[in-house]
From Swiss-Prot:
Subcellular location: Cytoplasm
Record: residues binding S-adenosyl-L-methionine: L9, D84, G87, S112, I113, L163, V221, H246
Protein known as: Diphthine methyl ester synthase
EC number: 2.1.1.314
GO cellular component: cytoplasm
GO BP: any one term: protein histidyl modification to diphthamide
GO MF term list: diphthine methyl ester synthase activity
Taxonomic lineage of the native organism: Eukaryota, Fungi, Dikarya, Ascomycota, Pezizomycotina
NCBIfam families given in the database record: dph5
Pathway recorded for this protein: Protein modification; peptidyl-diphthamide biosynthesis
Major localisation: cytoplasm
InterPro entries reported for this sequence: 4pyrrol_Mease, 4pyrrol_Methylase_sf, 4pyrrole_Mease_sub1, 4pyrrole_Mease_sub2, Dphthn_synthase
Function: S-adenosyl-L-methionine-dependent methyltransferase that catalyzes four methylations of the modified target histidine residue in translation elongation factor 2 (EF-2), to form an intermediate called diphthine methyl ester. The four successive methylation reactions represent the second step of diphthamide biosynthesis.
Family of this protein: Belongs to the diphthine synthase family.
Length: 285
């Protein structure tokens, strides 16, 4: 059987008891290593599990799934995913591939950023569509996320923005030359995300958000050094939140006063926070 095992958000101890039992008895254990990262190394996982873990990069998962699934019709294979197993469509594809091969699969869920973002004190049922922010380049600055944020803003809902990570990526030159040389890992910061959002607004000019829009920056959610910072997009574009992973929440206009009381504690500047809040935030129903 193929087991997709969620690892949670932070370290080796976040795995569930059920998930750990699967890892200990599986014939092979793979760690998906490109849609997200844990805050600890693979070696620390191996020490905790008491067994080797095979790192599965994008190429192996998306084009070499037969290797992962080999023998899973006769023995257990564990595929470990940071957060919750179905946080990325790639993992759905793996289950569908297993189904085509007549291999049973089972999912063992865990906490993901989609639920973990509740650490901000923002009520989860006040969130709208989640969007992703990719690294802008000189020639590629996609703004499709803006339309989804606009829909959330019109409903007064919060928007969770997931930030880009680049792991085992090739430059265009190395790709063109067929050289298997990979760029150093890159992880988008809250400051980069806020800056790109303001750049998008400058281009689209639809007033969906602006320099005075309130947002929450979250870093290393679930970890011992978790950090929250609240401020305007302008303030967050200048904040240093330390090592990855980062996420950002654009505050919805219908934010409740209890949410205000909770997040105000993390404000870059409480006077600026109060001024921005009083310009149009707060539940109206």
């Amino acid at each position: 059987m193929l087991y997709l095992v969620g690892l949670g958000l932070a370290d080796e101890t976040d795995i569930t008891v059920k998930g750990l039992e699967v890892v200990k008895r599986a014939e092979r254990v793979y760690l998906e290593a490109y849609t997200s990262i844990l805050l600890v190394s693979k070696e620390k996982l191996e020490a905790f599990y008491g067994r080797p873990v095979i790192e599965a990069d994008r190429e192996l998962v998306e084009t070499g799934s037969d290797e992962i699934l080999a023998g899973a019709d006769k023995a257990d294979v564990a595929f470990l995913v940071v957060g919750d197993p179905f946080g990325a469509t790639t993992h759905t594809d793996l289950v569908l591939r297993a189904r085509e091969m007549g291999i049973e699969s089972k999912v063992i869920p865990n906490a993901s950023i989609m639920s973990g973002i509740g650490c901000t004190g923002l009520q989860l049922y006040n969130f709208g569509q989640t969007v992703s922010m990719v690294f802008f380049t000189e020639n590629w600055k996609p703004t499709s996320y803006y339309d989804r944020v606009k829909e959330n803003v019109q409903l007064g809902l919060h928007t969770l923005v997931l930030l880009d990570i680049k792991v085992k990526e090739q430059s265009y030159e190395n790709m063109a030359r067929g050289r298997r040389i990979f760029e150093p890992p890159r992880y988008m910061t809250v400051a980069q995300c806020a800056s790109q959002m303001l750049e998008t607004e400058e281009e689209r000019k639809e007033g969906v958000f602006g320099p005075d829009s309130l947002a929450v920056g979250a870093a290393r959610v679930g970890g011992p050094d978790q950090k929250l910072v609240v401020g305007t997009l302008k303030e967050l574009s200048e904040v240093d939140m330390g090592p990855p992973l980062h996420s950002l929440v654009l505050l919805g206009r219908k934010a409740h006063d209890l949410e205000r009381l909770y997040i105000r504690e993390f404000a870059v500047d409480k006077a600026t926070f109060d001024a921005s809040w009083n310009k149009g935030y707060g539940a109206t129903s």
